Every structure is written in C-alpha cells, then in structure tokens.
Curated annotation (Swiss-Prot):
One of its GO terms (biological process) is sodium ion transport. The keyword Ion transport applies. This is V-type sodium ATPase subunit D. It comes from the Bacteria. Keywords: Ion transport, Sodium, Sodium transport, Transport. Involved in ATP-driven sodium extrusion. Belongs to the V-ATPase D subunit family. One of its GO terms (molecular function) is ATP binding. The keyword Transmembrane helix does not apply.
Length: 210
C-alpha cells in the first residue's frame, strides 16, 4: 500500500532519502537483533548451568541437614536457626549490554566480623551440621548470581522482542511502502513527461500546418 503523496520530483527525492535511512536502520537493527540473540543464548546456557549447580548443592546441604537433625537435639537446631548468621552487603549497579541496562549484583561478607559465618558451640554439633551450614552459606552468593542472570535474561528477551517488532515494521511495512510509492511517482513523472512531449509535438505540428 503506497503512501498518499503528490507525485513530484521533490517528493521523490525526499522519499528516496527516507528509503536509504530506513534500509540502513533495518540493517543496524537486524545486526543488533542477531547479536542480542547470540548473547541471550549464552545467558540461557549460563542460567541452566547455575540452576543445576545450585539445585545439586542445595540437595547436598539439605541431606546433611536432615542427617544432622536426626542426631542433634531439635532445641539446639531451633536456637541455631534463630541466630543472625552474618552481616552481608549487597550492591546493585547497572551495566549496558547492547543498549540494554541489566543488573550487576555485588555480594560481600562483612570482614570486620568473625571469620566463622555462624557462631555456635561444637558440643552439640556434628560433621553433617557443619557441612550443611557451610553449604547453605556458600549458596547465597550463587543464588544472587542466578537472580542476576535470570533478570538479565528477562530484560534481554524484552529487548529482542522490541527489536524484532521494529525490524518487521521496517521490513514488511515501511520499506515496501516507500518502494511502492517511489515506483508510483517515477511512473507518474514519466507519464507526465510523455504527455508533455506529445503536447509539444502537437503544438509544433499545428504551427507547421499554418
């Protein structure tokens, strides 16, 4: 469907410039879409690897915890879980991936505190409980990393969809409209030129007959 414009040379020049810009924009957006897809696939793989590793470590820590509960007094476990484990600091900054602002989470334990994550007596403890607590402690930064990657995947997917719509709009609407309109104006101008030539010939012939 062509645009509703006057078939003039000025309009033809303007539309040709628009077509050049639209074609260049389409290529840039298509390149961006391809690169976004490439990075998105890498992130999905990373997300799956992280999730599998976390699930495996969680199962191991839970297994140790269940074993520990069977050999340690329940009151001690309840008291232990009620204790504040450790102070941590989490900062979130933004980084730019192909014009997409994604979160970058930084996790850090408070080094001013005791190096032992949980302060509890070893009288009622056992190896399974120690491993379980250590395992859950090490999971926190990995869980934050997983959250970071999953949020990045979500934002990248939204940008890919947005870019895809823009690429399709240019490819299937804007560029074809411009090309059809340019063709129409060219045909109209050629038609006008032929009509003008025919008119001049007739005028010349009329002058000759006189």
């Amino acid at each position: 469907m062509r645009l509703n414009v006057n078939p003039t040379r000025m309009e033809l020049t303007r539309l040709k410039k628009q077509l050049t810009t639209a074609t260049r924009g389409h290529k840039l957006l298509k390149d961006k879409q391809d690169e976004l897809m490439r990075q998105f696939i890498l992130l999905i793989r990373k997300n799956n690897e992280l999730r599998q590793a976390i699930e495996k470590e969680t199962q191991t820590a839970m297994k140790d915890f269940v074993l520990a509960k069977s050999t340690v007094e329940e009151a001690f476990i309840d008291e232990l879980l009620a204790l504040p484990a450790e102070n941590v600091s989490i900062s979130v900054v933004e980084k730019n991936i192909m014009s997409v602002k994604v979160p970058l989470m930084n996790f850090q334990y408070d080094e001013t505190l005791n190096e032992t994550p949980l302060e509890y007596g070893y009288l009622h403890s056992n190896a399974e409980l120690d491993r379980s607590i250590d395992g859950f402690t090490q999971l926190l930064p990995k869980l934050l990393k997983l959250a970071e990657v999953e949020k990045t995947c979500q934002l990248m997917a939204e940008e890919i969809e947005k870019t895809r719509r823009r690429v399709n709009a240019l490819e299937y609407m804007t560029i074809p409209q411009l090309e059809e309109t340019i063709y129409y104006i060219k045909m109209k101008l050629e038609e006008n030129e032929r009509a003008e030539v025919t008119r001049l010939i007739k005028v010349k012939n009329m002058g000759t007959e006189e």
